[in-house]
């Protein structure tokens, strides 16, 4: 039996514990207020209005929404310290707008709120999963679209943090290499790479058909069809051998039906000196790691992943997968955002 260290968190008096739990309850409503503000463009319209803000009726008109519920949203957003209200006009703080709306920044959290709220729409089946241990299997198309919004932050992390940790990879991408993105979703990482490194040759593999359709449409709209090819398929042993210089999993390895098979198949695709890179958010190694905001978020995501048959892992558990697939021990690179890069490279 594996024993985990306990951090023995400080006991709270009853009144403090009550306040702590009430804060969790209000956090549920705050998440919904944020998601609605993002989806309906309320934060975007307030940001466009600048420091002067908008009247509540003006906000409803600008967002093409109904006045009474938008006014109620303003009350909830003000109560949650998301907007300011001087009695006549509502405005949004620039930093709040940046965090919730700017998708190309590592601080972007709008996708996290979209994912969390959207995932919770399936939780009418969560109690049954806990009783039986039988995952629900496939999630809805809306869930996969929310995952794409969630991973917008991952793309920013890759460009700002991962590439900074691997300057030799930047040089290779500039010169032009063959790259494959495994479980590419809607293809946003591929498009970002294509724009930044126009000599790179890119392939995206994705089994979920709704995501394949969105990725294909996005590539066509962006005029990147000569640089990016999307394939509707799973990651398996039938993938081309010795055809790529970089194989990339972005928040995706844990979703594979058999991660060991996926890693082995991916390794076979690489040419000499080729890299296999996994970017993800790993579970803490012990209980101490859960006593933080990051630990709380990862623990919640881990439960959601188990719900449909996926599994987040610690860095050590990832290393076990690599060994089981016959790969060398990956180098684990912790990033400032708390994400982790796992990197393995073929010999020359």
Where are these regions (language model features)?
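Conserved Class I S-adenosyl-L-methionine-dependent methyltransferase catalytic core
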Residues: 24-28, 36, 76-177
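A short acidic, Gly/Pro-enriched loop at the edge of an enzyme's catalytic core
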Residues: 236-247
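Core SAM-dependent methyltransferase catalytic element
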Residues: 325-348
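A short glycine-rich, Lys/Arg-flanked "PGG" loop and its adjoining helix->strand segment in the class I
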Residues: 260-272
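A short SAM/SAH-binding and catalytic strip from SAM-dependent methyltransferases
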Residues: 245-259
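C-terminal alpha-helical "lid/dimerization" subdomain adjacent to the S-adenosyl-L-methionine
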Residues: 279-325, 330-332
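Class I SAM-dependent methyltransferase SAM/SAH-binding core
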Residues: 180, 190-235
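Helix-to-beta-strand junctions that scaffold the AdoMet/dcAdoMet cofactor pocket
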Residues: 224, 256-257, 270-271
């Amino acid at each position: 039996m594996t024993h985990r260290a306990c951090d023995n968190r400080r006991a709270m008096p009853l009144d403090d514990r009550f306040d702590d739990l009430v804060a969790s309850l209000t956090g549920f409503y705050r998440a919904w207020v944020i998601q609605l503000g993002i989806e309906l463009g309320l934060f975007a319209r307030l940001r466009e209005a600048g420091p002067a803000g908008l009247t509540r009726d003006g906000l409803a008109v600008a967002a093409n929404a109904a006045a009474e519920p938008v006014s109620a949203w303003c009350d909830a957003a003000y109560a949650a310290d998301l907007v300011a209200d001087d009695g006549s006009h509502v405005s949004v703080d620039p930093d709040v707008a940046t965090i919730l709306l700017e998708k190309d920044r590592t601080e972007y959290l709008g996708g996290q709120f979209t994912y969390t709220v959207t995932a919770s729409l399936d939780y009418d089946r969560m109690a049954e999963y806990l009783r039986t241990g039988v995952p629900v299997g496939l999630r809805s198309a809306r869930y996969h679209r929310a995952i794409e919004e969630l991973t917008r932050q991952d793309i920013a992390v890759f460009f700002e943090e991962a590439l900074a940790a691997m300057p030799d990879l930047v040089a290779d991408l500039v010169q032009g290499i063959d790259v494959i993105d495994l479980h590419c979703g809607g293809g946003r990482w591929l498009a970002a790479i294509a724009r930044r490194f126009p000599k790179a040759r890119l392939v995206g593999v994705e089994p979920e058909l709704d995501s394949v359709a969105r990725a294909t449409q996005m590539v066509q709209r962006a005029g990147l069809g000569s640089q990016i090819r999307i394939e509707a398929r799973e990651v398996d042993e039938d993938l081309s051998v010795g055809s790529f210089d970089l194989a990339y999993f972005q928040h995706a390895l844990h979703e594979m039906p058999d991660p060991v098979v996926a890693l082995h198949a991916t390794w076979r695709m690489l040419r000499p000196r080729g890299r296999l890179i996994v970017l993800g958010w790993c579970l803490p190694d012990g209980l101490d790691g859960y006593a933080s905001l990051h630990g709380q978020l990862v623990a919640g995501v881990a439960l959601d992943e188990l719900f449909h048959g996926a599994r987040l892992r610690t860095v050590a558990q990832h290393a076990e997968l690599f060994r089981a697939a016959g790969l060398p021990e990956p180098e684990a690179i912790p990033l400032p955002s708390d994400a982790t890069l796992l990197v393995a490279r073929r010999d020359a």
